[in-house]
């Protein structure tokens, strides 16, 4: 797990809320503190679909929550890799990794005090593979953000 400060709020907010940069990620949860608090559980509530909704499907709704003359007091958004991307990512880290031991790779995005921070996260059930997965996810996260021209500095 590693934490970064996003160095350009405007550019990052544009990529998060206006562009499709994160649309393939799944929403785990989001909480927006505007004049009121709005919590979004990223799981489907209908019986037809299961799992988590994609960020692309709720991005517009979330943008409406923060839009206005004043910045929101704070918000946090937790995005995770889809099952397909999780399997592919784990294979790129180490072909011998057992995917059943890793239930998620996450981005924790927080906006607070007019600043964005990003923290990587993993959900790993096997202590022996935890370090390998954590370090690789940190590297892959940095590579992804740099490929999207999102400037970061490590905290």
Question: Where do the protein language model's features map onto the residues?
Answer:
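A generic structural micro-environment signature
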Residues: 23, 28, 33, 87, ...
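Acidic-enriched, low-complexity/disordered segments with a strong bias for Aspartate over Glutamate
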Residues: 11, 20-23, 41, 57, ...
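Surface-exposed, low-hydrophobicity interaction/linker segments
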Residues: 49-115
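Charge-rich, low-complexity N-terminal segments
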Residues: 1-60
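Generic structural motif
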Residues: 9, 37-39, 43, 82-86, ...
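Mixed-charge, glycine-accented linear interaction segment located at domain edges/termini
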Residues: 120-155
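General N-terminal targeting signals
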Residues: 34, 39, 44, 49, ...
């Amino acid at each position: 797990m590693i934490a970064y400060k996003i160095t350009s709020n405007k550019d990052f907010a544009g990529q998060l809320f206006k562009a499709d940069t994160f649309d393939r990620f799944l929403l785990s949860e989001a909480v927006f503190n505007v004049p009121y608090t709005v919590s979004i559980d990223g799981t489907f509530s209908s019986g037809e679909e299961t799992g988590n909704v994609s960020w692309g499907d709720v991005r517009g709704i979330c943008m409406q929550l923060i839009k206005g003359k004043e910045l929101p007091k704070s918000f946090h958004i937790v995005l995770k890799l889809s099952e397909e991307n999780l399997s592919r990512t784990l294979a790129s880290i180490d072909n011998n990794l057992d995917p059943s031991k890793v239930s998620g790779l996450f981005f924790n995005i927080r906006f607070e005090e007019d600043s964005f921070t990003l923290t990587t996260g993993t959900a790993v059930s096997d202590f022996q593979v935890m370090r390998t997965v954590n370090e690789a996810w940190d590297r892959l996260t940095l590579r992804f953000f740099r490929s999207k021209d999102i400037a970061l500095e490590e905290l």
